[in-house]
């Protein structure tokens, strides 16, 4: 089974967050970034499925070069491949369209996304990906056997 796990690069919840002097954006100076915890849960489930069914796990992130440590962490956890789509994740539909384009050009049996990202809490991207690909979708899964 070939599984795609979409991961976000988010500020650690223990980080002290400051804004730029104009108050319009995050000042990332000194902020530790991590794999979105909900996405890490999805990666863990993908690893369990791989243990029982075989296959490969690809992690995918939409972002700039600053997200490379997040992808490397996912590889260290057990993902087989990492893909970074070099784009600014400015809004949910932009992220979803970039992910949809990658999925359309590749072959995956299962696509796993966390239920939401802890930075925006939008819960939009997974549903948008499913709609763009005309695939079935379920959110906030608590089990998968």
Residue ranges: model-predicted function:
Residues 1-145:
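N-terminal glycine-rich FAD/FM-binding segment characteristic of electron-transfer flavoproteins
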